[in-house]
Curated annotation (Swiss-Prot):
GO terms for molecular function: small ribosomal subunit rRNA binding; structural constituent of ribosome. It comes from the Bacteria. This is Small ribosomal subunit protein bS20. Binds directly to 16S ribosomal RNA. Residues 1-20 are annotated as: Disordered. The keyword Ribonucleoprotein applies.
Length: 94
């Protein structure tokens, strides 16, 4: 138990922030996983989930939930995978 009111308040804030960050990270992981799964399927249909994942990564990074460099790294890898999938689809169609 906290000995000071300020310590008690910090504890309440920690609990609130932890819960918020946990929810954001969980949603983020789900969104990125959906994007990666979509990339294994039809490339034309995978652009929307990748865009949603990029948006979620940007939101999480701007709020400080995840580091900005981690968001950038994951976005880069998703974009590269999307590009490879679209190139593979174009060469297969030719």
């Amino acid at each position: 138990m906290a000995n000071h009111a300020s310590a008690d308040k910090r504890n309440r804030q920690r609990i609130t922030r932890t819960a918020r960050n946990r929810a954001i990270k969980s949603e983020l992981r789900t969104t990125v996983k959906k994007a990666r799964t979509a990339l294994k399927g039809v490339p034309q249909e995978s652009a929307a989930p990748v865009t949603a994942a990029v948006s979620a990564l940007d939101r999480a990074a701007s709020k400080g939930t995840i580091p900005a460099k981690r968001a950038s790294r994951v976005k880069s890898r998703l974009a590269l995978a999307l590009h490879k999938a679209s190139v593979a689809a174009k060469t297969a169609a030719s």
